[in-house]
Amino acid sequence: VLGAAGLAVLIAAPGRLYRLGGLAAWALGIVLLAVYLAPHGHRPLLAGAAVLGVVLAVAGAAVLKRWPWLLPLVTLACVPARIHVTVGSTEANLLVPMYGVVAAAAFLLAWELWRGDPRMRELGIAAWPLAAFAAWVGLSILWTGDLRQGAIDLLFFYLPFGLLAVALARLPWDRLWALALLVELTALALVFAAIGLYQYETRDIFWNPKVEIGNAYAPFYRVNSVFWDPSIYGRFLVVAILACLVVVLFERDRRLLIGATVAIAAIWVGLYFSYSQSSFAALVAGVIL
């Protein structure tokens, strides 16, 4: 509840000091949730890892301060990077690199607010609805039937990605950097699609034994590329296809138009072999909208 309330204040509060307080509450909420979820008997090890993480995050914040546009570029590159973590009897596939980026962004945001940065409500008209949603998510943990799962959702999804949204919104977006991000997104999607086609041809699935077992009994063969789950892989490709489709529909530069069209065709082939119904539904919805 504390972390979600802090995130809500950070998103919508009108003053710098209020936002600093919200950021502090967000950070404290993160720590308390991590302590609650940490396996007993391994907390000293996790505390040591946390200290190392803080040092690396501070260094990352210094890098982002010098080159702020690394934030969206590195964030996008970290999307598929799930690290298999085992602590005692607890196993999980976590977005560890992404959480490192979020921590660096949090330290940079704290520094900027401390130094008197007057910006507020960077998310514009979405600030109040998102703040209300964050607060509601935090409150809902008070009556959830599964407290542990609620804590996991807050710690690994809502709290870090809420702050990341604020950090990204603070950047002075322009056409050049949007194009750079599109190029990175398209290049990653093409590489991932090629890896997916390799998996289909060789029948070699990475990371996830559940997909291998499912393929053994299914009439089709699903691939996951470098992602843990075929559906997550498919959704990443859908985002790339829709971004390229915007270029096809609205860009007048012939080279960009041809390149985007070819990319859509190649990425779609990779998407097909994910056999992800949710991804195809998202693609249809995105094209219609």
Regions found by a protein language model. Give the residues of each.
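Aromatic- and kink-enriched transmembrane "portal" helix at the membrane-lumen/periplasm boundary
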Residues: 83-88, 145, 149, 219-227
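Juxtamembrane transmembrane-helix termini
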Residues: 167-169, 173
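Alpha-helix C-capping/helix-to-loop hinge sites
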Residues: 87-88, 142-145, 169, 269
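Transmembrane signal-anchor hairpin modules in multi-pass inner-membrane enzymes, especially those
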Residues: 1-139, 149, 173-186, 248-258
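Alpha-helical transmembrane segments of multi-pass inner-membrane proteins
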Residues: 1-10, 19-34, 56-59, 103-106, ...
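Non-cytosolic membrane-interface motifs at loop->transmembrane helix junctions
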Residues: 149-156
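Aromatic/pi-system hotspot detector in well-structured domains
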Residues: 99, 156-157
